[in-house]
Amino acid sequence: MSSLLCLVAHPDDETILCGGTLALLSARGVDVHVIALTRGEGGELGEPPLTDRENLGQVREREMVCAVGKLGGKSLTFLGYVDPTVGEGGELSAPAHDPAMLSGQIIASIKQTGAQVLLTHGSNGEYGHPAHKLMHAAALIAAASLGGAAPLVYSFAASYENHPYPRLSNADDPADVLVDVSNFIDQQLAAALCHVTQNALFVRRRSQEAGRPFTVREALLMEESFHRQWPSHITHDLFLDWVSKK
C-alpha cells in the first residue's frame, strides 16, 4: 500500500500549495492523509463576511473537509492548535505549542498512516509565515527522531526559475521535482472553491498586481514544485516514482 502524509498549518494550504499533486497521487492509488495544525481561526471571515470570529474555526473545518474530499484524500485530522489572529499591522504568528508534543503528534501520525512520503511547508514558510516554518521544523524533528524508519520528507512551493508566483515559493529550497498538475486543475478548483471564506484572499494580491480581477482558477498553479528535505541522499526516490508514473 502506498501512503502519503501532508502536513499543513491552516485550511486551504493543502489546496493552494500542493492540491494538484494530492489529486494526482490519489488518482494513482496513493492513500493521501492530510493533517492540519489549526482550523484557521485567525484567517479572513470572507468578503463580505460569511461568519464571525467566534465561529470561523468551525466554518473553516467544514471547508477543509470539503476540499480534502474533492482532492481524493483518505483522511483529515486537525491537531487542535489555535490559529492566532492577524495583527493590526498584518503581523503573522504561530500558535502556542510545545515543540516536543507537536513532533510527537507528527511521529504518531506517521506510524498510524504508514506514510512513506511526507509533504509539508518549506524552510522559508513560503511567504515567511511563522506557522508554516513551525510545521517545517516539526516535520524534520520527527523525521530525525525516526531515523531509518522515517518517510521521505519533501517540502512544497520550491523555488525555480520563472516561478509564476515567486512570493509563494521558498527561496532556500530549490526544486528537485516539478509536477505537471494541469490535468487536475478542475479538482483543484473545486477544492479551492470549498474554502469560500478565503476565496477573496486567493485573488486579492494577484488582482492588484495584474490591474484586473483575477479568478480563483487563474490563481492556481499548473505546475507544483517540491524540494527533498530528508534524507539528503537516497538511492531510490519513491515520491519521484509516484509523480512520474504514466
Task: Give residue spans per PLM region.
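Metal-dependent de-N-acetylase/amidase catalytic core
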Residues: S2-L5, G90-K246
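Active-site rim/loop-helix segments in enzyme catalytic domains that contact anionic ligands
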Residues: M1-T113, I141-S145, W242
